[in-house]
From Swiss-Prot:
Entry EC no(s): 2.4.1.253
Identification of the protein by name: Baicalein 7-O-glucuronosyltransferase
Protein family according to the UniProt entry: Belongs to the UDP-glycosyltransferase family.
Regulation of protein activity: Inhibited by copper, zinc and iron, p-Chloromercuri-benzoic acid (PCMBA) and 4,4'-diisothiocyanostilbene-2,2'-disulfonic acid (DIDS), but not by N-ethylmaleimide (NEM), dithioerythritol (DTE), calcium or magnesium.
Gene name as annotated: UBGAT-I
Uppermost EC category: transferase
Gene3D superfamilies: Glycogen Phosphorylase B
Amino acid sequence: MAVLAKFISKNHPSVPIIIISNAPESAAASVAAIPSISYHRLPLPEIPPDMTTDRVELFFELPRLSNPNLLTALQQISQKTRIRAVILDFFCNAAFEVPTSLNIPTYYYFSAGTPTAILTLYFETIDETIPVDLQDLNDYVDIPGLPPIHCLDIPVALSPRKSLVYKSSVDISKNLRRSAGILVNGFDALEFRAIGSHSQRPMHFKGPTPPVYFIGPLVGDVDTKAGSEEHECLRWLDTQPSKSVVFLCFGRRGVFSAKQLKETAAALENSGHRFLWSVRNPPELKKATGSDEPDLDELLPEGFLERTKDRGFVIKSWAPQKEVLAHDSVGGFVTHCGRSSVSEGVWFGVPMIGWPVDAELRLNRAVMVDDLQVALPLEEEAGGFVTAAELEKRVRELMETKAGKAVRQRVTELKLSARAAVAENGSSLNDLKKFLHATRD
């Protein structure tokens, strides 16, 4: 939400924004210096002893526990100023009834982008037309605004019809149609299929839907400061030829087994290409050692670091992703397909290889490969394992072949479209103006 708040403030600095959250105030440090943005911290709710421990279910349930505190906060703020709109992250659907009970126009924001927004909007129809668990269907689902999506590419958490996440998703789908509008981290050229579907039959699926505003891509600022350990890789990139380095980075959730790390190392060595690789400690070793920092000599094949030292750089854990993608030496990006990573890859014009690791990421890959054509797919074995031969093949394909050149050309075109969307009179800034105008009515 902080990135969205900064985007609104940058383009409309006179609009006052209050971020309401129960996260520590340190989480709002990035907006502390912006006069139009303030932070209201909610008290942490009391957690019932029988609360679910499932990570995904917690995303949906924790906001419900904060509803009494949210109601109090909105009432207090309303005594000082008129609240023209509330924007909810879609994970905070449980809070929808709080602002609407106060007659405050309530919008949903999808930072995860259009594929997730469309799937969520369509989910009530899926619930009514597909009577079995999605993972058992073994077929494609036709969703207006998306390419044909195989059921195995729909987040696995949505499969058990009796699960809390499934029921919450149906509830969100219904509330989306009751909301004042939907804000999506995307832009016209990136969402051409969704926009075409919406214009032809206004995404009505189960009835009329509210306006959809594409206001992206929301890409944070690039920090090119040198000298700190985490930016050492940027100095290494300075010594590499233009568009020669393959960057591998997999987000917060991209943690691989020791076996997969060895397989990845073999692929990179055999490919012969330059690489920058962000490695995190495997779950089994992190649990045993209590450390996030991997022991590269122990994890990677014997002699790998020495043999590849002239063309490879391995980062322990965190990598400055935006800064790396912005560097001229980077010519390819192996990504977990998270929306932020996809947006950054497009923004900086870096062709991608899609390696989804969780949740909505398979859905994102399907769109990246089939619709946008900005990525090559990786074929996975059972359990999501990727062989060295498969990864080597895709790296070579991206960096050496006509297919890779076509992906590079397409992502370069979208890079220009992305920057045009957030320039003066661009499509995303125009949608932002429409949204703000709607809140003044």
